[in-house]
């Protein structure tokens, strides 16, 4: 209709978030690792600006229950607050002997704390991993754990005339734009054939992100002269996840053990270090008695030392259970050198368990 006008308005609501970090160092920590030690409680702490909200950390050296007996469990507990509940997010990590942040675990969703309620991780760190690397985790027999807490505070509105719209993060804009080039096949200059499907792509982006594609185009290999370039060794879903990462740095479907198992070899073959790290993280978090042997094989085949170390440590802790699985029995035949490495890791862990007793006996002579 002539004369119609569109009016736009916007508002701004600010949610205050208070953040603080608490470092807790426990001396002579090796003495807490015996079966008799149920839990250790930190000193009470609070945010400087909110003294009325008091917290503490609780650490269980032998786990909090039967299921977590092979792990250290750690929790954040609300001790007191003028108003309840308290809404907060939190993150735990360890400081190793090099002063580095290790084993970061965070809660991504806001948690609701009532007084004396606690939230945390009952499988925070494998006891066997700690005992077999005591010099790294316990410098001078001191264990340092850190907790970052983000507390949701007051909510208030700001007048429209005093606020301008926020500017979108340019890094996100870049990945969105590159993703659009891929999704909509805009201005492409090469074609990839995967499982009978053709995909238009950009040589410059492929070469910049993957040394394998770069070598292919630089050296004018046979594949670079063909159109389309046939990719023989990738499943269609794996290819799409890999290409999505190449263009955007994201892998939105990489959350299951099976998907990570399929994507890891592709990431290794095409030199996508960032994608390998994402796969390692998923596989580490999904380690279980059932998956341990297969994960160890994958780590060995694709040169992922962190994942291999985690798998060996897990197998050392759960040796009896893992050795009964069909995957382990199959590995005896297909990858005997990994079985030997697993036994070596188990022997090292056992030596660490026995070491305090040996010292005790020698002191009694």
Curated annotation (Swiss-Prot):
PROSITE patterns: BTB, MATH
Domain BTB: 188-250
One matching Pfam family: MATH_2
Residues covered by the MATH domain: 19-149
One GO BP annotation of this record: protein catabolic process
Cited SMART domains: BTB, MATH
Source organism superkingdom: Eukaryota
Similarity comment text for this entry: Belongs to the Tdpoz family.
Record-linked PANTHER family: SPECKLE-TYPE POZ PROTEIN (PTHR24413)
Protein name: TD and POZ domain-containing protein 3
Gene: Tdpoz3
